[in-house]
């Protein structure tokens, strides 16, 4: 879209938002914060943060490297 079209859409959106007096942004944010999806995302974020903190604060000892397998024994005929 060109700039004029975007400007018209922006102005119309502002006019509509100005006319809707019952819409309160704070109430909208509150509803979003209490939604089930937001709760799931916050829980997942907390879990990931805890896992990261545990990994950073107490790094696990590196497991000893596996002993490389030698060349397989050849069968005698």
Curated annotation (Swiss-Prot):
Homology family: Belongs to the non-disulfide-bridged peptide (NDBP) superfamily. Long chain multifunctional peptide (group 2) family.
Propeptide: 74-77
Gene Ontology CC: one annotated term: extracellular region
Protein name: Bradykinin-potentiating peptide
Subcellular location, principal: secreted
Organism: Tityus discrepans
Endpoints of the signal sequence: 1-22
Localisation: Secreted
Tissue: Expressed by the venom gland.
Keyword tags: Antimicrobial, Cleavage on pair of basic residues, Hypotensive agent, Secreted, Signal
Reported function: Antimicrobial peptide. May also inhibit angiotensin-converting enzyme (ACE) and potentiate bradykinin (BK).
Biological-process GO terms, alphabetical: regulation of blood pressure
């Amino acid at each position: 879209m060109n700039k004029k079209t975007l400007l018209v859409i922006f102005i119309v959106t502002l006019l509509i938002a100005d006319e809707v007096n019952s819409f309160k942004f704070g109430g909208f944010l509150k509803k979003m914060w209490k939604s089930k999806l937001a709760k799931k995302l916050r829980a997942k974020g907390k879990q990931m943060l805890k896992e990261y903190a545990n990994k950073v604060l107490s790094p696990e000892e590196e497991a000893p490297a596996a002993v490389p397998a030698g060349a397989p024994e050849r069968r005698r005929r």
